[in-house]
Amino acid sequence: MNEPIISLDSLSFSYAPVPEDAEVTEATVFDGLSLSVPAGVTSLVGQNGVGKSTFLLLAGARIFPSSGSVSVLGTDTRAFVRAAVDPEVETERNRLVSFIYQNMEFETDEPIGDLMEYVYAEGYYERKDPQFLARIQRELDLGKLLSRTTGTLSKGELQRTIIGFSLLYGSRIVLMDEPVFALEEDRKERVFAFLMEIAAETGVSICYSAHNLELTGRYSTSMMLFFKDGSVRVGQTGELLQRTTIEEAYQVPYDMLYRKEYLYREMLNAMPRPGGG
């Protein structure tokens, strides 16, 4: 049996109170949570505010447990606690796991095509294949963006570009927090299908959060289902994506949940999209 890519052992995590704001009190997200995440493509599913982003930050060694431990490919994430101030530690962390933040933005004067070549050249793949770079750009429909800079992109264009960077970087695990929320539905399908291909071909594992249950059902091999009480179930996508289980997690009728998703997509489709997705 394959070793898990991420393991939590009696993990507890709380966000600290903010002294300047009496309304922001200590918030416990996880309390004694233990689980393992298998290799492959894993979707994170659950209501807002149930810990999906917090889990990704913990697994990516961007934040650290209050107690218990998180291991990534057998390495305790506390080994990377100095990554923010020690470039060597940061390099070792990023070799194992990289992170796409929700609403991630950055600006640079360098053309996107040049940045992609640099990221691939300086990344962690042992073998460099120019055709792989060209394929990333083609499959993510980045060809017309290569001469532009990140500051000129629409939200959807930037999301596709950042996904491209993450795949070129060569980390063994890529964590993505809502990586395609700004894309049109057909683009989401193409991006997720491509992520499944890349994971199968390269052995890179991908964990992503998303709200569209239809997409997560088709484009993940495993699922993490987050509940409001702080518990999390991990299993094969087809086993967890069942009416009774989803209703238990979301605490709304299954049909109503899908209706809500449909209305949300209709609302997005009706909105103007400057620059496209």
Regions found by a protein language model. Name each.
Residues 68-81, 93:
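Conserved ABC transporter NBD signature motif
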Residues 129-145:
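Conserved ABC ATPase "signature" region
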Residues 103, 109-122:
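Q-loop/switch helix immediately C-terminal to the Walker
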Residues 239, 243, 249-277:
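ABC ATPase nucleotide-binding domains
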Residues 210-211:
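H-loop/switch region of ABC-family ATPase nucleotide-binding domains
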Residues 60:
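Helix-to-loop junction immediately C-terminal to a conserved catalytic motif
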Residues 149-153:
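Conserved ABC ATPase signature
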